[in-house]
Amino acid sequence: RALLVMYLTQHFLFGPAEAQGIYAAYAALVYLMPVLGGMIADRYLGARKAVVIGAVLLVAGHFTMAFEGSGGKESLTIGERAYQIEVVGRDQNRTMFAVSGDERVQISITPEGVSKVGAEPAAAQAADAAAVAAVSEGFPAFTPAGGYKVETKRDTAFGEPVLFLALSLIIMGVGFLKANISTVVGALYEENDPRRDGGFTIFYVGINLGSLLATAACSYLGFTYGWAYGFGLAGFGMLLG
């Protein structure tokens, strides 16, 4: 959840409410689709074919998530000057820069306003943007809320369509796999085989252990090295499975 929500808000620049809405819809469909996947398997495919189809869809979905596209872009306008906002890093290590020509300044945007990182405290607390602009040349030390404008350009041509395609593939994959994998495990044993309970115990331990390790590893790679690494690892994990 954390990786996906951060991916939506920091890479594609969805608002927090919009990102939570996308995640909620995704989570709801992940839980609902196994009902449809089970019905299709019972009537047409059989459990084994459904599991194979689900696994292929999950691998495709997670690898598709690794195609980031350009992501959203933000621009900052202060008075007559326009800057492109450049972001380096992810999560808590995310650093923002305002770039205009050869000028590149680290900034911080809060509800109070836009601050130039490293500015003098007295200037950073100033309430008059014009007065602050006179304190230092170039980027003002502090511009209060209302004295600047941030515009967001979303990656609707490539990145977002690929994102929703990937989520759709994952949802369909879970629908086929989750509803039928238990049936396949159960079919490995005769009805009264004493090993049956042990087999299901191993199965569920593997699921929970894999979920724990995958969450930690994918989140670490995604936040530390890049979104594509986190989602790509999930794809490799599904492929190996």
Listing of model-derived features with the role each one plays in the protein:
Residues 8-9, 40-44, 217-226:
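Interfacial helix-cap and linker-helix signal at transmembrane-aqueous boundaries
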Residues 176-190:
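Intracellular juxtamembrane helix-capping segments at the cytosolic ends
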Residues 24-42, 178, 209-214, 239:
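Central cavity-lining transmembrane alpha-helices of secondary-active solute carriers
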Residues 18-19, 53, 192-206:
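Cytoplasmic loop-to-transmembrane helix junctions
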Residues 50-51, 163:
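Primarily marks hydrophobic transmembrane alpha-helices of the MFS/SLC 12-helix fold
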Residues 54-158:
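C-terminal ends and interior cores of transmembrane alpha-helices
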Residues 2-20, 186:
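Short amphipathic helix-loop junctions that connect adjacent transmembrane helices
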Residues 164, 228-241:
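Symmetry-related core transmembrane helices of the 12-TM Major Facilitator Superfamily/SLC fold
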